[in-house]
UniProtKB/Swiss-Prot annotation:
NCBIfam families: hscB. It is found in: Mitochondrion matrix. It holds the Pfam family HSCB_C. Changing residue 98 to A: Inviable. Abolishes jac1 ATPase activator activity. This is J-type co-chaperone jac1, mitochondrial. Residues 61-137 form the J domain. Co-chaperone required for the assembly of iron-sulfur (Fe/S) clusters in mitochondria. Stimulates the ATPase activity of the mitochondrial Hsp70 chaperone ssc1, to mediate the transfer of iron-sulfur clusters from isu1 to grx5. One of its GO terms (biological process) is [2Fe-2S] cluster assembly. Transmembrane segments: none annotated. Keywords: Chaperone, Mitochondrion, Transit peptide. The gene is jac1. Disruption phenotype: Inviable. One of its GO terms (molecular function) is ATPase activator activity. Its main location: mitochondrion.
């Protein structure tokens, strides 16, 4: 549950947040304001989806693991994926890795391939992790954008949303409305990501990916109330 900071308004936190939060880049030590506390972004972002650049060349391309069943990533293919085809391909391939089927194959190797396939599936099925992975395929760190410099109005919008959540925490109806509004924001960001990636506008894509990550965090906060 959100906790009130005494009788103080949320507004006094803004100047402090701008100095201590929003003037830092979104890296492993970046902090995000949530539930009237500061949390490091690396506690929110699942870095297990990403490899270092040195490891990426050795890892299997997630899209190629489902080659022939889903389209190529942007800009060659669309951002959207046929989720039904992705799931069917995943389940079919997982069956071939089952110990009863993969006879003669090293058990450890089959287990590794199964883990890689699951990781690829879980990454590609969700818009945010898919977008982050596509950026990585382009050699772009998906959590490197400094939103504090590129989109200060967006940061103020986030602060307003947190304030609205705090004011509505005892009203299920208002919280539901805030959740629906946040879903609309996420759809809008995904639309912008789609347009940017399919036109090879990677700077814009990175900006909107980071915006979507913030709205996903708002989802988590609302879900936990």
């Amino acid at each position: 549950m959100l906790k009130q900071a005494g009788n103080q308004s949320f507004r006094p936190f803004i100047s402090f947040a701008q100095k201590s939060l929003f003037n830092r880049q979104i890296t492993g030590n970046h902090w995000i304001f949530a539930r009237f506390k500061f949390y490091p972004l690396n506690k929110i972002v699942n870095y297990n989806h990403f490899h270092s650049s040195s490891c990426q060349s050795e890892a299997k391309n997630f899209y190629k693991q489902f080659e022939g069943d889903i389209s190529d990533p942007p800009p060659k293919g669309p951002f959207d994926i046929d989720l039904g085809a992705l799931k069917s391909s995943y389940l079919r391939k997982m069956k071939t890795l089952h110990p009863d089927v993969a006879q003669g194959k090293d058990a450890a190797l089959a287990q590794r391939d199964s883990a890689e396939l699951s990781k690829a599936y879980n990454t590609l099925k969700a818009p945010l992790t898919r977008a982050e992975y596509i950026l990585q395929l382009q050699g772009i760190n998906p959590v490197s954008e400094d939103i504090s410099n590129s989109d200060p109005e967006f940061l103020m919008e986030i602060m307003d949303v947190h304030e609205n959540i705090s004011a509505s925490r005892d009203s299920p109806e208002k919280l539901l409305q805030l959740s629906q509004e946040n879903q609309g924001r996420k759809v809008q960001e995904i639309n912008e990501i789609r347009k940017a990636m399919e036109s090879s506008n990677w700077d814009s894509a990175l900006l909107y990916v980071n915006r979507l990550r913030y709205w996903n965090t708002i989802d988590k906060i609302l879900h936990d109330l």
